[in-house]
Swiss-Prot record:
It comes from Homo sapiens (Human). Belongs to the CLPTM1 family. Residues 1-50, 614-669 are annotated as: Disordered. It is a multi-pass membrane protein. GO terms for cellular component: endomembrane system; external side of plasma membrane; membrane; plasma membrane. The lineage of its organism: Eukaryota, Metazoa, Chordata, Craniata, Vertebrata. This is Putative lipid scramblase CLPTM1.
Amino acid sequence: MAAAQEADGARSAVVAAGGGSSGQVTSNGSIGRDPPAETQPQNPPAQPAPNAWQVIKGVLFRIFIIWAISSWFRRGPAPQDQAGPGGAPRVASRNLFPKDTLMNLHVYISEHEHFTDFNATSALFWEQHDLVYGDWTSGENSDGCYEHFAELDIPQSVQQNGSIYIHVYFTKSGFHPDPRQKALYRRLATVHMSRMINKYKRRRFQKTKNLLTGETEADPEMIKRAEDYGPVEVISHWHPNITINIVDDHTPWVKGSVPPPLDQYVKFDAVSGDYYPIIYFNDYWNLQKDYYPINESLASLPLRVSFCPLSLWRWQLYAAQSTKSPWNFLGDELYEQSDEEQDSVKVALLETNPYLLALTIIVSIVHSVFEFLAFKNDIQFWNSRQSLEGLSVRSVFFGVFQSFVVLLYILDNETNFVVQVSVFIGVLIDLWKITKVMDVRLDREHRVAGIFPRLSFKDKSTYIESSTKVYDDMAFRYLSWILFPLLGCYAVYSLLYLEHKGWYSWVLSMLYGFLLTFGFITMTPQLFINYKLKSVAHLPWRMLTYKALNTFIDDLFAFVIKMPVMYRIGCLRDDVVFFIYLYQRWIYRVDPTRVNEFGMSGEDPTAAAPVAEVPTAAGALTPTPAPTTTTATREEASTSLPTKPTQGASSASEPQEAPPKPAEDKKKD
């Protein structure tokens, strides 16, 4: 069964690595200029799409952030007796725009981050008067929303990778946002927010070619740009939609006590201490795939600006979504989500039935629990294992090989840091298992280069002295007759029809693709050993059960969420192998009362032993304990026949009751 757990773990790591191997995209998120996000290369190698579990993990992470933000609100505002500047107590503030305040909306578009040219008619994009703060019934659709669409004439600087900003002003009715108009401008009657509306993405170019012909299918223009700008080019991208939300909130916030990340949106007036209405630029539902690059060929850009009121609760959700991951302290390039991962979560939320989505989230939590239990039982099984009878040692070594190939592949493709760490931990666990299946020691007599001690590996006696080693060697010999021809065919196909960065990348890509396609075959040697031993009692059934349940959950996700056909086939073939294990468990049932070929049974060692009555000199019968047999756990019981009990010798002088007849031998399976 070691082969099953190793191959199953490698399959999960391989799919996870494939989902994040190319250049990725990260969102702007915060107000103002953000770090450039990364876009996918124009000629990426063929990679599997992110699996269902990656999509669900993204949803669960967002739910956790939402819960954390909500917990701050349940704590309530800070007490008013907190000391402020000069020792005076801090008091709760109020919204400078009371509910039902009449206000005007002014939207300006400019290439300058700080806007001052209010007299330029070309900069004014939209002006909407007589809006009511907190009105949810006006507008064309009676939802309080308004929108405006227009084509923007973009200047040459924006065409040449420059920035463009949106400046939004809300003023109370009768006032103007221009500070130079003294009669119409009031500081406490004007709220302003701006943001860069284009997004910078890194476009990575990987110089790949056919290693035999030297030809490439990459766009010649892209090759020229890569020669001019290098392998990574930062390009401005555009999305035609953005929503301006004003939060309908009158919470008595206390300055200095607003929990993050909400504190970056609540702006207090320095003189009055009250806070301005909260303006939020909402682009959460803008899918990454809908962004397109801005270049010299575009003379204008379409822009649709929507205005909608936003409740406090929904604003908390969006603010939580825009919160950067806690892993970002490692750097934006180390932890990032791909375009597919970001869009798949949003599409799932938009298109999936709410009941089905709720069921999927619940099952995802169960999947996480099973994943943890499988990991825990796997470690416990190998840590407490004393005998290797019935276990495939070669499968453990093949699992180490699989893990190393996956690790080298994701390092070569510059996958994000979190995936690299998780795969590296998996490699360490696989290496630790080697110490449990072999005797590993440092040979200080035969040193490497005369300096470093040499590692010595030796098979354990419980493996050598049993028939398991013979069956293990036989299984892998038969397996090699299938794997090596398949590996050769796949290597030729990869060399003839796919492009690679170099020979090293070709070797890793070829091995990675081969393991992804045919790795499930390595689960079969354990089936062969079980067949030869006519027993499955040596297998870690708890760990196997958790992994089987997780595989069935993966099947559910694969058919509920849009997934590649090859991934669905991969889940199905793993199910077939697990069903074979279940069939073997059914036909090779374990009888806990039998003693196996190792002299062990599955009886409870604490159970009382049967007693025989022996007559004393006075003729009375006294109980005498019968000899006990060595016991073992139920999982280590075998299907061998029990040994016959020996009869005690009769005394010549005193009569002894005849011993009970031995039970009939049970029928072999």
